Curated annotation (Swiss-Prot):
Keywords: Hydrolase, Serine esterase. It is an enzyme of class 3 (hydrolase). Gene3D superfamilies: alpha/beta hydrolase. Residues 9-20 have a biased composition (Polar residues). This is Protein phosphatase methylesterase 1. GO terms for biological process: cellular detoxification; protein repair. Its EC number is 3.1.1.89. One of its GO terms (cellular component) is nucleus. Belongs to the AB hydrolase superfamily. One of its GO terms (molecular function) is protein C-terminal methylesterase activity. InterPro entries: AB_hydrolase_1 (IPR000073), AB_hydrolase_fold (IPR029058), PPase_methylesterase_euk (IPR016812). It catalyses: [phosphatase 2A protein]-C-terminal L-leucine methyl ester + H2O = [phosphatase 2A protein]-C-terminal L-leucine + methanol + H(+).
Amino acid sequence: MAFRKEELSQTLYENESEQSSETKELMLNNEESLSDWRNYFDEKLTIPGESGALNGTINGYLTLPQPDGCLLVLQHGAGSSAMSFAPVTQELLSNSDNKVGFLALDLRAHGETTLEPESDMSLETLSKDFTHAVSYVQRMFELDEKIILVGHSLGGAICAYCAFQKTIPNTSGLVVIDVVEGTAMEALGFMKTYLSNRPTSFKSIDDAISWHIKTLVTRNRLSACITVPSLLVQQEDGTFVWRTDLYKTSPYWMDWFKGLSDKFLRAPYGRMLIVAGTDRLDKTLTIGQMQGKYQLEILPETGHFVHEDVPAKISSLLLNFWHRNQPLVLPPKVGATPVLQ
């Protein structure tokens, strides 16, 4: 039996240390149903690829905005899935009077997306997939609401690329979560070591969730219960392995992040960067922040998966960002003479 959305909106978003014993018991008794997408989105989409369904489909989850609202397009990072943003969505919905909608997409070679070839993970290809999927949803549902692009890690690089290139109509804002060109490029040298120390399989989903918590990949157990199952696929012997082979993406790592800071700063929309610490900033973004070119938010109590660790804070930042970037409509001047045509 799935959680009611009302229960989720009341209990999902505190840090684990802040959760009551009742909340923890409710969570542990319902871990399997927590990962059901229906708790967080209204629709599941199967979007044909740019060349049609012959080369596979893109998996997405959608909740439509109200006519005077906006659509947040949520793109996860490498090795993650669209469900990475699920802990945020109910808080967004309940605090926006249902005005905000959201579209979360599985990247190529991730989640339930089946696009081929899965080996092509270049930033250009991923950005084309992203643009195609968003444009398809805009046409299919006749959406003309403003769009804010929100991306975590690699997803942030994709969103920055598309914002800089202006590939998605009606975009009004760009939010990048915990990815900066300089620090990302430095971290790439340690990625293969990290991957080699990571388990290749788990006996159960619960073991995988426990590993994510123990290693601080995710610092919120409830979020881990929601997001981790979509990262794994079950083998014939009953064990669970990673859906995405991150080793195979290594030829593209430099390509993903090169020029990211410049693209972010030159995107012609409102910009917000959310990071886990000031040490994440590189020189370009430090100078840009001092010049007031973007909004900077620092959440030091979090790890790399900021939006999973503190979803309530992320949802609050996103809603405030949306309100600040809405077009200003000025009232007519008092006593102004109407112009006759």
